[in-house]
């Protein structure tokens, strides 16, 4: 935990190229994910009527972009998993296989131009070169454009004791304050948000390269974090102790059970 920028993160990382250059999870195999993508497109289309072009970072098989394409938007995806990017391209969802960063953003600007909307859903907290990604977003977004960042919300992790979400693929655990601090550093300013059911409680935070009037609900969320002391190390320390107590209670329960024990895990 950094007391200056209020970011919570893992103390060690695994190289992103090792983790994501070949990936197994494909968005299109989940009916829930497909329906959510449809709603996501409808919501952004209604909120930001001036949008004509969309770029998605970590676009996977293009399930989300497919919905935008149906509605006539110019689209482009970027995904580090070559096997999945290949699948998306076969389905005519133009996808660049690679890791998005500042250098790639410069190439995209030449070939695609500046998009009106840049989307990064559940990816920003997963990579160690996070500053280069945000620099790339700032370099690429239209001056009147919108950036939509979806992430598992720190408050939901703490409230639900969701320590199962803390592992090597998830490096950062953002609050509204911490991710806003990061983007503000590179000239992107939060102005609104929506709740998301993904990952057990996420938010979609909207940024602009221009300082816009904050929505009332965003101001309320800022005040909520202050009241809950979400960006206080003591809050995180208490969460850590609760996780350990929960683990100990579960171990005790399992050890006291008689007979066979069956486990089932799902993602």
Features from the language model and the residues they span:
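A short glycine-rich, Lys/Arg-flanked "PGG" loop and its adjoining helix->strand segment in the class I
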Residues: 131-146
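Conserved SAM-binding strand-loop segment of SAM-dependent methyltransferases
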Residues: 92-107
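Extended interfacial segments that mediate partner engagement and assembly in macromolecular machines
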Residues: 1, 6-87, 162, 167, ...
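Short, glycine-/aromatic-enriched active-site segment of Class I SAM-dependent methyltransferases
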Residues: 147-172, 176-178, 183
